[in-house]
Curated annotation (Swiss-Prot):
<keyword id="KW-0441">Lipid A biosynthesis</keyword>
<keyword id="KW-0328">Glycosyltransferase</keyword>
<comment type="function">
    <text>Condensation of UDP-2,3-diacylglucosamine and 2,3-diacylglucosamine-1-phosphate to form lipid A disaccharide, a precursor of lipid A, a phosphorylated glycolipid that anchors the lipopolysaccharide to the outer membrane of the cell.</text>
</comment>
<protein>
    <recommendedName>
        <fullName>Lipid-A-disaccharide synthase</fullName>
        <ecNumber>2.4.1.182</ecNumber>
    </recommendedName>
</protein>
<dbReference type="InterPro" id="IPR003835">
    <property type="entry name" value="Glyco_trans_19"/>
</dbReference>
<keyword id="KW-0808">Transferase</keyword>
<keyword id="KW-0443">Lipid metabolism</keyword>
<comment type="similarity">
    <text>Belongs to the LpxB family.</text>
</comment>
<dbReference type="Pfam" id="PF02684">
    <property type="entry name" value="LpxB"/>
</dbReference>
<comment type="pathway">
    <text>Bacterial outer membrane biogenesis; LPS lipid A biosynthesis.</text>
</comment>
<dbReference type="GO" id="GO:0009245">
    <property type="term" value="P:lipid A biosynthetic process"/>
</dbReference>
<dbReference type="GO" id="GO:0005543">
    <property type="term" value="F:phospholipid binding"/>
</dbReference>
<keyword id="KW-0444">Lipid biosynthesis</keyword>
<dbReference type="GO" id="GO:0008915">
    <property type="term" value="F:lipid-A-disaccharide synthase activity"/>
</dbReference>
<dbReference type="GO" id="GO:0016020">
    <property type="term" value="C:membrane"/>
</dbReference>
Length: 378
């Protein structure tokens, strides 16, 4: 390998900025004479990335919003591809944001540059033909989960399982008593965390349902307490409106602090999504619920190939965690499913501990080693 190394990274959202900064630290630890170029957020810039434009310009959610910004996104991608081809980095790493980064990777690879994609899109669940595009776009896929690595191996895509950064961040044994003390919760008695999602649409579909479920559980278990971490001020206001006119609940609303809520609780009622991985890593028994618009559900039923929607079940390869979806997600059913886990959730917890240890690979270090090995093979 030459003395100096130029690495291009492109991230499109906050989670990618976190992953990218960790990867940059690990790369510099192994190769001090390194230059970073590309697109990233404040964490990546703090590690020395010269960002060609603000990462926020790529962070768009929702079909209507994407359509409104499509001309700008296409223009920025075209300009970025041209700039990176001229810069001739030793390797280019696209971090998540596949709708933007895979197109960049494909063009750069056609121009003879090495390309890596960090964080697999959900090709194993739906639109599986995207794996053909991925195979053309990147020299190496860095997968966070072992089932993703198996999928890519089966489809002839070079892949490295690197583990998940959260598995190193979250301790193998969380201190429940300390978390309760920090949140002002009593040390004794049982606590259920209600986690209806971080987006307005999710909370709109699941918030009242989760509160109804809590009231049913309280009838059966009068000493129960609840915590609900709100992802933003807007989500807190949404929940507070839902609480108006209800029977009083022993409920503590938190501003953020989802990890504290998980550390403090005994079980979780949770929306399907990345938070289920956090609940798994905190070893908290859970019931997963999800509701979407009727038309969306019918479309997804036709498109989705996976038998499960939650990460714990995908990691287990079986129905370990109850999933109540759409019309099956009623207050009665959710309460009846969650209540036994407050008495004995050991079956879930034993698996959660095993998968935590399997994912605890020091992902940034593993990813850096894989990237440098790819560069050295050139």
């Amino acid at each position: 390998m030459a003395d100096g190394l130029r690495v291009a990274l492109v991230a499109g959202e906050a989670s990618g900025d976190i992953l990218g900064s960790g990867l940059m630290q690990a790369l510099r630890a192994r190769h001090p004479d390194i230059e970073f170029i590309g697109v990233g957020g404040p964490r990546m810039e703090a590690e020395g990335l010269s960002s060609y434009f603000p990462m926020e310009r790529l962070s768009v959610m929702g079909l209507v919003e994407v359509l409104g910004r499509l001309p700008e996104l296409l223009r920025r991608r075209k300009r970025l591809i041209r700039t990176l081809i001229e810069a001739r980095p030793d390797v280019m790493i696209g971090i998540d944001a596949p709708d933007f980064t895979l197109g960049v990777e494909h063009k750069l690879r056609q121009a003879g540059l090495r390309t890596v994609h960090y964080v697999s899109p959900s090709v194993w669940a739906w639109r599986q033909k995207r794996v053909l595009k991925i195979r053309e776009a990147c020299d190496l896929m860095l997968a966070l989960f072992p089932f993703e690595a198996r999928f890519y191996e089966e489809h002839g895509v070079p892949v490295r399982f690197v583990g998940h950064p959260l598995a190193n961040t979250i301790p193998l044994q969380a201190d429940r008593a300390a978390a309760r003390a920090r949140l002002g919760l009593p040390a004794d008695g049982q606590v259920v965390a209600l986690m209806p999602g971080s987006r307005g649409g999710e909370v709109g579909k699941l918030g009242a349902l989760f509160l109804d479920t809590a009231q049913r559980l309280l009838v059966e278990r009068p000493g129960l307490r609840f915590v609900l971490p709100c992802a933003s001020a807007a989500r807190r206001e949404q929940i507070e409106q839902m609480l108006q006119g209800r029977e009083p609940l022993p409920l503590t609303l938190l501003d953020g602090a989802s990890h504290e809520a998980l550390a403090a609780c005994d079980a979780v009622l949770i929306a399907s999504g990345t938070a289920t991985l956090e609940a798994l890593l905190y070893k908290r028994p859970m019931v997963v619920a999800y509701r979407v618009a009727g038309l969306t559900y019918r479309i997804l039923k036709r498109l989705v190939k996976s038998p499960y929607i939650s990460l714990p079940n995908l990691l287990a390869g079986r129905l370990l965690v109850p999933e109540l979806i759409q019309d099956a997600a009623t207050p009665q059913a959710l309460a009846a499913t969650l209540s036994p886990l407050l008495d004995d959730g050991s079956q879930q917890v034993e698996f959660f501990d095993a998968i935590h240890r399997a994912l605890r690979q020091d992902a940034s270090a593993q990813a850096a080693e894989a990237v440098l090995q790819l560069v050295e093979r050139r």
